[in-house]
């Protein structure tokens, strides 16, 4: 690199056109100062989050946003200005992104030399892929932290919605209760933004490194079907407004590069569009219940086409980096969200009573005056004398403690009630057994009685017959002995008299 020369503003670099009309158009449409850029970004976020059907906004600002990202990433690389047919070469500025870009460029060259030493074909292409994998692995802990924070925030969405409905119109109260909820859950709402912000300098540095290598003419070798990783265009050509001049206009029915090379260069942007579309479909299916994801589906459908268009105006080495990064990012998100790679830090946080249905059930079952008072005061402020009177809130943690005590009391009452029901059931069972035993005894006695009655029949002359035959009657005689039946005794006396 030569000595450092301060760069002109980015909007002047973008406005190097041959005609004044186009120059004025580019300056007014794509210029961006720091103040206007931050305002544009805030507007873009608001549009993406709350108005997904804003097609006019996307049409007017999509290309502007893409050029802004590209210029921010390569503003310190070698750029060219076309002034009266001459080209002036500028160098990197001494911003802190340049240091990262220099390190990335050095690592890329070391990887390329190492692969060339072991005679690996397409060494620069594989060096780009390997460098992307290394950077992705280095930033993986931050990505995991960001996904876990997003999962935690998604888990608390019902509680936050209940707080917003309960204190509707009182933004200060909503913020206070939401902050208390975050504190009880032990999460930081900014934890999901910080990892993403931390990875931005790394990826911008990598982008600049690849741009510098392409501008230095080091990516002249091909990669499988790609004729050259430095083609079909350059960053400087895109900045001059001729990024897709290799496609149009046709010359005698043929593109400027000819059909074979043109089709070969088109394969990589098409793969990038397909991979981006597939990534969006996978992520939307994994977040199908996320309201924020549903509201941005209309915008994300256009994202693959915008990225594909942008890939047409940069060297193929950058497109190869985007494709590799997109595949790795999709694989990371799928593993973290679908296969348990990331753990929800608030998964066990189930003791918060902030959902509307649970709150209503608890409020209806409260019987203590103190709890009734605290709940009613927290729910809505009373009006007295035409003025809105907001009662004092209980001490921090007081309401939660009362709720826990009430819940424990109801649990004890439920257990006692279950024990009483079990004892009553056992008592009823014992009584039923006793009644069954009594009824069985009565039935047996009745059967015995019927048997005796059927076996014993009285005759008409006063004798007792057993089974229809005369039986011996047990009579006590005057001398205390037992005699024979009356008929037998008379027969014996007659026989004695005859003798």
From Swiss-Prot:
Annotated GO biological process: chloroplast organization; protein localization to chloroplast
Pfam family, one: 60KD_IMP
Coiled coil region boundaries: 397-436
Keyword Transcription regulation: no
Tissues of expression: Highly expressed in green tissues.
Amino acid composition bias (Basic and acidic residues), ranges on this chain: 379-420, 430-452, 486-499
Region (Disordered) residue spans: 378-499
Chloroplast found in the keyword field: yes
Biological role stated in the UniProt entry: Required for the insertion of some light harvesting chlorophyll-binding proteins (LHCP) into the chloroplast thylakoid membrane. Plays a role in the accumulation of some cytochrome b6f components in the thylakoid membrane. Required for the assembly and/or stability of the F(1)F(0) ATP synthase in chloroplast thylakoid membranes. Functions to stabilize or promote assembly of F(1) during its attachment to the membrane-embedded F(0) part. Participates with STIC2 in thylakoid protein targeting. May function with a specific subset of thylakoidal proteins.
The protein's assembly and partners: Homodimer. Interacts with ALB3. Interacts with STIC2.
Protein name: ALBINO3-like protein 1, chloroplastic
Organism: Arabidopsis thaliana (Mouse-ear cress)
Organismal lineage: Eukaryota, Viridiplantae, Streptophyta, Embryophyta, Tracheophyta
């Amino acid at each position: 690199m030569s000595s450092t020369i301060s760069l002109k503003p980015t909007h002047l670099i973008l406005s190097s056109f041959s005609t004044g009309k186009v120059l004025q158009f580019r300056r007014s449409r794509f210029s961006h100062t720091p103040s206007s850029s931050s305002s544009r970004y805030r507007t873009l976020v608001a549009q993406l989050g709350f108005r997904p059907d804003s097609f006019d906004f996307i049409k007017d600002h999509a290309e502007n946003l893409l050029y802004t990202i590209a210029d921010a990433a390569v503003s310190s690389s070698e750029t060219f200005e076309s002034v009266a047919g001459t080209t002036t070469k500028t160098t990197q500025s001494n911003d802190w992104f340049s240091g990262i870009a220099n390190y990335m460029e050095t690592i890329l060259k070391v990887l390329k030399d190492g692969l060339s030493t072991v005679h690996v074909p397409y060494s620069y292409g594989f060096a780009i892929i390997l460098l992307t994998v290394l950077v992705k692995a280095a930033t993986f802990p931050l990505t995991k932290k960001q996904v876990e924070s997003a999962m935690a925030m998604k888990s608390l969405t019902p509680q936050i919605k209940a707080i917003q409905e309960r204190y509707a119109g009182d933004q200060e109260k909503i913020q206070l209760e939401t902050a208390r909820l975050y504190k009880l859950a032990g999460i930081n709402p900014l934890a999901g933004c910080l990892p993403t912000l931390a990875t931005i300098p790394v990826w911008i540095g990598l982008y600049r490194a690849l741009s510098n290598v392409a501008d230095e003419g080091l990516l002249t070798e091909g990669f499988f079907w790609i004729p050259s990783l430095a083609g079909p265009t350059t960053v400087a050509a895109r900045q001059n407004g001729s990024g897709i001049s290799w496609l149009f206009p046709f010359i005698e029915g043929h593109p400027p590069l000819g059909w074979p090379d043109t089709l070969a260069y088109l394969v990589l942007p098409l793969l990038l569009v397909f991979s981006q579309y597939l990534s969006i479909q996978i992520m939307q299916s994994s977040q199908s219940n996320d309201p924020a994801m549903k509201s941005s589906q209309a915008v994300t459908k256009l994202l693959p086409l915008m990225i594909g268009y942008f890939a047409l105006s940069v060297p193929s080495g950058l497109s190869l980096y985007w494709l590799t990064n997109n595949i790795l990012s999709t694989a990371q998100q799928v593993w973290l969200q679908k296969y348990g790679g990331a753990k929800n830090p608030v998964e066990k946080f189930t003791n918060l009573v902030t959902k509307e249905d649970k709150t209503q059930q608890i409020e209806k079952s409260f019987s203590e005056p103190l709890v009734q008072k605290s709940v009613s005061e927290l729910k809505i402020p009373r009006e007295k004398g035409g003025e809105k009177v907001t009662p004092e809130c209980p001490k921090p943690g007081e309401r939660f403690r009362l709720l826990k005590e009430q819940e424990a009391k109801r649990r004890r009452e439920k257990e006692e009630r279950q024990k009483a029901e079990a004892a009553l059931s056992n008592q009823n069972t014992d009584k039923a057994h006793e009644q069954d035993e009594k009824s069985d005894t009565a039935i047996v006695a009745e059967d015995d009685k019927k048997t005796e009655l059927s076996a014993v029949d009285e005759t008409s002359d006063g004798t007792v017959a057993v089974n229809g035959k005369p039986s011996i009657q047990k009579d006590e005689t005057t001398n205390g002995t037992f005699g024979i039946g009356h008929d037998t005794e008379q027969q014996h006396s007659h026989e004695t008299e005859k003798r």
